Amino acid sequence: MTNESEVGVKKAAELLRQGATMLEEACPICKMPLFKLKNGDVVCPVHGKVYIVKSDDEEKIVKRNLQLDEIESILIDGLYLSAKKMKEDPLDSERIIQIIRYLDALERLRKIKINSSE
């Protein structure tokens, strides 16, 4: 057994001990069985959260949501770095404008996410 599969088996055993249910579907990447947690999430013991889609339209929606989440994460990281740099010079007008732009972009992104989920 390879090291990765040993780790996967140990994590799978831990998921079962925690009350997860083993599903008949397998991870498309590593072929390990998928597990359904008590909260309803489906996870691979090796790769973490997995999204099961039943149609091309559903796949597009999931991919779009993942991309929006990634963009949101990038914006939050940029906002955090700008705020951290602003501590050095609180009167830096360029930095203030940059923070406002990050906040505006985050607000727009969240509106897009809300509208797409309706």
From Swiss-Prot:
UniProt superkingdom: Archaea
Cysteine disulfide partners in this protein: none
InterPro entries, alphabetized: SSSCA1, UPF0148
Pfam families referenced in this protein's UniProt entry, alphabetically: Auto_anti-p27
Family: Belongs to the UPF0148 family.
Name of the protein this chain belongs to: UPF0148 protein SSO0781
